[in-house]
Structures are given as C-alpha cells and as structure tokens.
UniProtKB/Swiss-Prot annotation:
Cyclin with roles in multiple processes including transcription, meiotic recombination repair, cell cycle regulation, and promotion of normal growth and metabolism. Binds to the promoter region of the homeobox gene Abd-B and is involved in maintaining Abd-B expression in the pupal epithelium. Involved in the transcriptional repression of the homeotic genes Scr and Ubx. Pfam families: Cyclin_N (PF00134). This is Cyclin G. It is found in: Chromosome.
Amino acid sequence: MSVPVRYSSAAAEYAAEVDCELESTLQQQQQLHLQQQYEQYQHYQYQREQDIAYYCQLQAARQQEQLMQQRTSMSSSVMPGLALPQDHQDHPAALLNGPHNNNIGLAMDAHSINAILVDDEQPSTSAQAAAAAAASAGGSAGAGSGSGLGGAIGGGKLANGINRNAEMPTDWMRIADEGRYGTPGAAGLEYQKYEQQQQLEDLAESEAGAVGGASNNNGESSSSLKKLEDQLHALTSDELYETLKEYDVLQDKFHTVLLLPKESRREVTAGGRDGSAYVLRCLKMWYELPSDVLFSAMSLVDRFLDRMAVKPKHMACMSVASFHLAIKQLDLKPIPAEDLVTISQCGCTAGDLERMAGVIANKLGVQMGHAPITSVSYLRIYYALFRNLAKEIGGDFFKFYQQLIKLEELENRLEILMCDVKTTVITPSTLALVLICLHLDFHIKESYTRGSPELKHVFEYILFLQQYMRIPDRVFTCGFSIVSGILSHYNGQNKAPYKQRLVWKLSSRTLRVLRPINRFSSDLPTIEEGIPNALDDGLRSRTESISSEEEEDWPTSPIIPIFEQC
C-alpha cells in the first residue's frame, strides 16, 4: 500500500523541523555549558585574587605585630585574627569565605592593637596631676612659685600629649621612621644590636687576655674625674657659654616633673622612688662608677615613671634595669646582669632585667653612646666658669677656690639632692646653679668678711648667670628653698659610713634540706663577775653592730622596706 504524496511530504517537513529544534536545543545546551564553565573560571580567578590579597594583608599584619613586639620588647602571643589557617588551600569553603574572614580578622586586629596602645600609652597619675597643675596655673595668676613651675612644665606635657588618636598604620610608619632618630619605635632593634656588639667585644677582650670585671671600673673612676677636670680647665669661658646653650636646648628632653603620691597601693609613691634612688647610689658606690651613671639612670627612672603606669611591685626591676641600661648608654664596662640582680636583691632574674632594659630603651628612645643632659652636666660647666672667674680675680681668692671648692664634693651633694623627688620640679640648670651658689656661700662665710671686694664680683657673676640661663627670680628662690631644706636635713643627721647588710633569702625547700650544725658558730668565753673585761672593744667581730640595729635614714636592705611593701 502506497502512502499519499501529501502525507509523505508533511512527515518529511515535520521530521526536518524536529531535527532543527533538536539541533538548536543541543547548541543552546552547549552554549549554556560553556557559559557556566566561563563563569566558574572567572569565579575561580576572583577567589584566587581575593586569597592573594588576603595573604598579603596577613603578612602586613604580621609585620605590624612584629613592630609592636619590638616597640614593647615583650613576647606576646600571635592574635587569633592574624593566624593563617592551615587548611587554607585544602578546603574550598575556606576560599569562598576568605573575604568575610578577612574583614573579621582585620576588625579583631584593629581592636586588639587599639587596646594595647591605649594600655601602653595610658598616662600615669603623676602625668594627670601635672596636667591639672598646668590648668590651675593657667587659671590663677597669683599661684606660688613652686606650683607655677610645675604647672608650666606639666602644661607642656599636656600640649605634647594632643593628637594621640592618629591613624594606626600612619602611626606605625611614623614610629618606624623616627625610631632611628631617638624617638620610641626602633630603639629596641638598636638595643639588640648594641647587645650583640657588646658580646662580641667582650669575647674579643677575653680572648686577648684583658682583665675584666669591676677592677677596670675601679681603676678608671679616679682617673676619669681627673681627666674631666683637666678638660674643663682647658676650655675658655666662651666655649663654656656655647656648651651651656647646647645643653639648654636639650635639657627638656631628659627632664620631667614627677608628682607622686605619698601613699598609694596602685602607684609608685614618692618614698618608693627615693628609696630606689638610694639603692642605685649604693650600687654606684659599690662598683665605683662615675656620677654620670647614677644621674642617667635616675633620668630614665623618672621619665619612665612619668610616661608609664608602673606598679609598685615592678619598681625594683625597673630601677635596676635603668641602672644597667645607663652603664651601656655611657659606653662603660658592662656589669653582668646576674651580678646586679644578686647585689641589688631586686627579686627578679637576669632575663627579666634584660627584657625590662629593652622595654625602657624602646619606650624612651634611648640612643647608645649618647650621654643625656642632666644636672651634673650643668654643674661641671658652672664649676669651670667660676674657676675662670676666680682665676681672673686672682690673689687669695683663686687659692681659696682651688682648696675648698671641689668638684667631687659638689657631685656628691648633687647626688643627695637627686635622691629626693622634690628636686624634679626644678630644671637641671637651675638645680646646679643653686647648689654651687649655696656651696660658695657656705665657704665664703667662713673665709671672708662681708665687705670683701672679691665678693662683689662673685655676686654680680651669679646674677649674670641667672639672666644668661633665663631663670626667673621666683623660680630661683623656690629652688633655693628646696635645696637648702634638703641639705639642712641631710647635714643635721648623724653621718654614718655607707653600709648595706646582705640578706640571704632561702626558700622553704632549702630550709628543709639544711641541717643545724655547730661548725659555723664559735663559743665565747664566759665573763666572770668582778674581773675586768680582757677583751678590747676594738676586737669585736661586728663593726658598728649597735648602729646597724637602729633605724637609719634609708633601709639596710633595699628590697624589704622598699619593694616588698606592695
């Protein structure tokens, strides 16, 4: 049976249409599949770029964290937001959630670092008191001379503390750039380089057979003072005036005003600061170091107390670390940290002392090899200027100056003044000038009459120096009263030789191991009644045993009354 032609042609057309639709459907499916593959490839490229950017940001955050660790010189654990996940390349979900995790990590990083900076840069109570004194001094025109001086300097600190809330990356870049110029930031790296250099030098000296230890400092202490006096005598008055101008520009960098409370459990008190100063003075005399070490160390202590909120329990370690850092800053023979810890009994380890010294050097921007400008620097210049004046006057006055006015005695009295926190309200230039004027006045009253012609030149020169250093009369009068009061109190006490008993501290475990033996005890003969004592008082084994049991001006053991009361 044959199919009609019209039906066969319709079937052919229908088959052709079905084939065309099927072919177009297949083409559309292929295009859709290619488009999906292209979109997946673009998404993969985008995720890869996001991962690369995220990794770069993590590296930058790690570098910033290392910079913060160098700034604080303290080991801190890595923040969770900065940690790179281990399965970052293994799981696709971690790649898809990369930008979200990046934002969360950066937010946590910013909050954590802001909290650290707020905690580090939080001003102490003394700084707040100085700012309050500055505000009160600006509001009242009739304030006293002492409060006016403290307020003026405190106002300068308040002005310097403005604009602390700067942008974080900009602040870090500024710190990294300015650290090498002496401001906080890169001083920790400089301190580490100095440590390595000192270790290499010590190793070379030991291989060469050089004699180390405190004997070098002992031999150099007396000769260094003599060399210093010879250098001062060789300078002319014009050169000394130029030196005074240079010191006047830099003295504010190394001086601060401390307003510490008398009693406090959360903050270092004035007594704790003064007790630490006496301990450092004892260490200076024990190692026979020059006075520059003590003044540099106390400059570090005062500035660190003013900038940071130091707890009383950390005062011992901080003060001895400042002493250790001052020795290195002045390029003197370094003293091992273990010896300082043992002699000072500061209650910390040698590693703690080194870390604390790094923190102080980082916070204060200490530059190794550059001596700070302190009151002893001004005192030596004033001493040389008055010596030149005595040489110009000539006659008996020059002999009087050479015999009675000694630089070593002036430095000792300045050390006594430095151990009192009240002298921090006086600038170093004013303190040194007031001290040498008081010293001259004391010896002039004993050797000269009031109407001597030599005294007129001396008094006129004192007024000239006061005007040259731009010291107001009220400031000079205030400093005069403070210095005279401290020296009068010191001279009125019973002078006793410098002594400090070593206190042996044993743990409970060591006490349990020790056995009571009589090998270290000796029995003294019984003194019979009615027979004169055959033993002379000069043969007593303990010298000054009576006075050592009495109350003294400063504690016999520095750690018990000063540092363990907190």
